[in-house]
From Swiss-Prot:
Protein name in the entry: Nuclear egress protein 1
Pfam short name (any one): Herpes_UL31
Single GO biological process annotation from the record: viral budding from nuclear membrane
Name of the gene encoding the protein in the UniProt record: NEC1
Similarity comment: family membership: Belongs to the herpesviridae NEC1 protein family.
HAMAP family: HSV_NEC1
Presence of keyword Zinc: yes
Length: 318
């Protein structure tokens, strides 16, 4: 066993017995007063450059930022003297630290926000659904929407991933798409040919009807002879799921402008072609489809609905 030197004995005798005084002498305590030797050491370290000390300070800020959530969870409030300014300074200096902090969060920063009509659908943030009602309109995170959660098992046809594939598989199905074709023919005989040369119109009708229920399309023309489609949905409220918005914006958003508005007592999704972009047509037998549509029988209720909605669209333009 090594002999105990007198200096070691003196040092032990000078150490305070009170634990509180021991903490005051610890270098990490806030009331600790550095000795001349420790001050000399700090000066020698500072010669390494300001950048290293700044990096060390940011690392300390980062270590506190990583534990800020856990402190709030354990104690209910933040008991440290760590300011928000220091926190955001550390986040801005270390991008990875910011991502780590977001991973520790239990709830999203922004779940829902109010929106106003008319609203462009292609400008909405991805992963959100649209809820419209007489009490207000909101854009809600799909994972926090009870309607989207309850309808998460809704089957989405694989053909919806392609505009042209959906058009090719459904353009000859006259009876299932009777409302689309009757409205197209009611607009004008030439509108049938124009509608068949714009596959995105039938695609938008199929996707919107699949997710939003019964709809009635009304057609009009722009100044260049291209068709504009108004999809009217009856009811006091409307929910457009995030999957529906994603399919519409990704597949026809580059060539068509998509907007939702309130026309009279009905919600309306307007599908209008962009002026500088043209879509690729799909080769189909237009004459055979026209003959099938011309002889199509439909009830007076559907014809009256198309007439009323057409008048409503014309009045809304004025």
């Amino acid at each position: 066993m090594a002999p105990v030197t007198p200096d070691a004995v003196n040092a032990r005798q000078q150490r305070p017995a009170d634990p509180a005084l021991r903490r005051l002498m610890h270098p990490h305590h806030r009331n600790y007063t550095a000795s001349k030797a420790s001050a000399h050491s700090v000066k020698s370290v500072s010669r390494c450059g300001k950048s290293r000390s700044e990096l060390g300070r940011m690392e300390r800020v980062g270590s506190v930022a990583r534990s800020i959530c856990s402190r709030h969870t354990r104690h209910g409030v933040d008991r440290s003297h760590f300011s928000l300014r220091d926190f955001f300074r550390g986040i801005s200096a270390n991008f990875e630290l910011g991502k780590d902090f977001l991973r520790e969060m239990n709830t999203p920063i922004h779940v829902s926000e109010a929106v106003f009509l008319p609203l462009s659908l292609c400008t909405l943030s991805p992963g959100r659904c649209l809820r419209l009602s007489p009490f207000g309109h909101s854009l809600t995170l799909g994972s926090h929407c009870e309607i989207c959660i309850n309808r998460s098992q809704v089957h989405v046809p694989q053909e919806f991933s392609s505009t042209q594939l959906s058009f090719f598989n459904n353009v000859h199905k006259i009876i299932p798409n009777k409302t689309f074709y009757v409205s197209l023919l009611s607009s004008s005989p030439s509108a049938v040919k124009a509608g068949l040369s714009q596959p995105s119109l039938l695609y938008a009708y199929l996707v919107t009807g699949h997710f939003c229920g019964t709809i009635c399309p009304i057609f009009s023309t722009n100044g260049k002879g291209r068709l504009i489609m108004h999809l009217l949905l009856q009811g006091t409220s409307l929910h457009i799921p995030e999957t529906c918005l994603k399919l519409l914006c990704e597949n026809i958003g580059p060539t068509y402008e998509l907007a939702v508005d309130l026309v009279g007592d009905a919600f309306c999704i307007k599908v209008s072609p962009r002026d500088t972009v043209y879509e690729k047509a799909v080769n189909v037998d237009e004459d055979a489809i026209y003959e099938a549509i011309k002889d199509l029988e439909c009830g007076d209720e559907l014809r009256l609905q198309i007439i009323n909605y057409t008048q409503l669209i014309l009045e809304n333009k004025q």
